[in-house]
Amino acid sequence: MRPMPTPPSVTSEARRAIRRDDATRIAAAVFLTLAAWIAGLSPAPADQLFSAPAETLPPLSLSPDDFYGGPGEVQNLPPPRPQGPVLLDGACAPDSCCPDGCGPHGGYPDCFDDLWAPRPWSWHLLPNNLIYTSYLAGPKESRIGSSWYQDTAPDPFEPSINNGWLWDTTLGGRASILRYGSDPVLHPQGFEVQIEGAAFVRLDPADDRDLRSADYRFGVPLVYGIGRWQTKLAYYHNSAHLGDEAMLKNPTFPRVNYVRDCFVWGNSYYLLDWLRLYGEVGYAFFNAGGSEPWEFQAGTELIQARPTGSRGAPFLAINGMSRQELDWGGNVCVQTGWAWRGQRSEKLFRIGFEYLYGSDPQYEFVFYNQNRAGIGMWYDF
């Protein structure tokens, strides 16, 4: 009797491959049986499932025409978008552009690539941002801000000496109440009702930080914006007051009861995402304390349009004012420094240098001039 041949040895890797193949066939059989039962068909016998010959895929054949619309037709990539200056108009950092869970055409477009794209309009009560924003270098704009400066102009209380170091603070803000329009993070469009108000306070650090003067402002702008253009029709009230401590120490100083109730028409246009031009004209229908009806204001701003992240970006702002009671004189203010813009809103924080020459923006001293330079910080929300 001839001995049985010894079977070839099977490695452990081969055994595992056989077991995986068997498991795959069993899973396929179960899946097909359930699918046939759900569809109301008779399942195939199990022996057919396991004994069916393996099918091979047809050979893959590719040609250049498969990647284009047809012979001779070439599809070009879209042209690159100009980004402008690196710091003022560069792309956002990946961690500061598109929040998680944000779908297409939402409040957070693709890293804010197109700030002016049309978006759906609807009603919004108390939206987070503004269609018409405050002028960065405007000395009578409602915001939170503070500046410390040295003024070489004569002191109104003692003309024989200079004003020296003074401290001006603005406590206020501008907010949107109601909007019919779009609601992106940056540069919304539509119709909007805003309110704005602030107290403009001047302290004298060299004299026990006495309150020299305070102006109070309240206004209601009606705003419309479409694309890169914004316009406003606004009313504001401004009144000037001499500080109580300054009044007690200088009882002979002639107090001015400067008051304006004014209608304003303003326009703003963004030539580039980071370059804004604006101008406005105001007519006061009620005047007191030397105020006269007409005033004009214009300026420009260069600032990063998109969220800056923690690194920030430089800014430059220039504003000029002209008023009828000053024989069409006024003042010019220049600010430059570093700015940070919020990720999920248009909130803007700035620090930098400020220079102002001309009529004192504290209207209690409207007929006195300033020539001042210093540092400041400003917050718009």
Label the predicted regions.
Residues 27-40:
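Bacterial N-terminal signal peptides
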Residues 43-46, 51:
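Boundary at the C-terminal end of the N-terminal hydrophobic targeting segment
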Residues 50-54, 58-74, 78-93, 97-103, ...:
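Transmembrane beta-barrel domains of Gram-negative outer membranes and organellar outer membranes
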Residues 132-137, 178-193, 271-275, 304-315, ...:
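Short loop/turn motifs that connect adjacent beta-strands in outer-membrane beta-barrel proteins
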Residues 146-148, 195-199, 233-237, 279-283, ...:
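Transmembrane beta-barrel strands of outer-membrane/channel proteins
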Residues 160-166, 206-210, 285-294, 308, ...:
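Solvent-exposed loop/turn segments connecting transmembrane beta-strands
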Residues 184-302, 357-359, 366-369:
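Outer-membrane pore/translocation modules
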Residues 334, 369-381:
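Outer-membrane beta-barrel "beta-signal"
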